C-alpha cells in the first residue's frame, strides 16, 4: 500500500496530468493520491496559489476582484477542456472559487488560509473526476472527511495526534482516494494550512496514518543530488538517505522536500522515495531509517547563507557556572532564536540567522553581554555561510574531517568555525559568504567524482 504525492509542477497542465494518471494506473498499490495546487506551466506563468493570494488581497482591500477570479477559473477551465471532462466539474470549481468572495472579512483569522487552500482543494476534485473518466475508481476526500484535524495556527498548522485514529480508517476503502494537500481543519471546523509547501506534510501524515508500505513524493527532479546543481555541474544523485541525513541537508538549504514533512513518516517508520513525474522509471532517492550499506561516508554537501555570529570572550569563562545560560537568556528576552553555539575555553560564539537581528537589537545584545555577562570582548560578525558535510557513516570512517579541512585549505578557504554534533551525522563549517560556492565545490570534489568539473 502506497501513498503518492504530486507537486505543483506535476499538476500544472493537462499534459502533466496524463503522466500522473499513467503513474497511478501502473501500480495498484498506489491507493492514496495527495495533490498540490497547479504550479507553473512555464517560467513566465503564475502558480495558482500565488493567484489566490492576489485574489485574497484584492478582496480584503475592496478592489475589483473580477480579474483575479476569472484568471483562476480560466486556469482550471483550460485543464477541464483539454482533458475532456464534463462541464459539471468546472461548474463545481467555479462555484467554489466565487464563494470565497462571500466570506466575512472581519474577525476571520482563517480567511487567508481558506483562500490559499482552494488551490489544492479544487485540483483534487478535478483529478478525481479525471481518474474516474479514465478507468480508475477514484473518490475525492476532503481533509475533514479524512480526519486531518489540526491546531488553530493559521499558516502554521500542526496535526493533532488523535487524528491518526480516523486517518487509519481510510485504508479500508477499495477506491483510490484523492486528497488535497496543504491544509487540515481545526476542531472548530475552520480550514487551516500548514506552512507553504505543506502538501508534503499532508502526504506524510496520510502515509503514517494508514501505515503505508511506502510514501512516494513525485516532483520534477530525479531525486536528491549530492550538491546543488546550480553550483556543481551534473552532481551525483543520492540513491539512499536516512531521515537524519535528509533533515541535516534540508536545514542547510536542500529544498526538494518540506523538512517538516519528514516527521510523521519518520515516526511512523515509513520509507519515503523522491521520484520524478517526468521520468518515473528512475529509482529516485529513497529515505529510510537506517542505511543498507556503509560504503559511502558522505552523502551530500549543502550550504546556506545569511548567518551572523556573536563572538564573545572572557578570561576563565569555562569556570563560570551559568555563563552560557546568561548569554542565551539575553537572546531569549529579545525574542531572538539561535542555531549553533561553538565554544572554546575562554570564548563562545552564537550563530544565528541574520533575519533575527535589527540594528537596535544588535546594540542591545552588545550592551547586555557587557553589563550582565561581563564579557571582556564581544563583536557581531555578518555575512557568514554555513557549509554542511552530511553522512551518518562518517563516524565509522577515519579521516573525513582531515579530508574536508585539507580540501578547504588547498582552495584557500578560511574556516571561521567548525562544529560536529555528538551524533556525528554532519560536520559544519562556517565561512565568509563570498567563499560559500568555492567551499562547496572544494568539498564536493574531495568526496565525490572529481571528473565532473564545472
Predicted regions and their residues:
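Nucleotide/pyrophosphate-binding catalytic subdomain
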Residues: 1-258, 262, 430-432, 451
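Glycine-rich beta-alpha junction loops
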Residues: 38-39, 221-223, 272, 276-281, ...
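Active-site-proximal loop/turn and secondary-structure-junction residues that shape catalytic pockets
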Residues: 37-40, 183-184, 278, 316, ...
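A conserved regulatory-domain signal marking ACT and ACT-like small-molecule sensing domains
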Residues: 283-454
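Structural motif
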Residues: 1-2, 30-33, 137-139, 175-178, ...
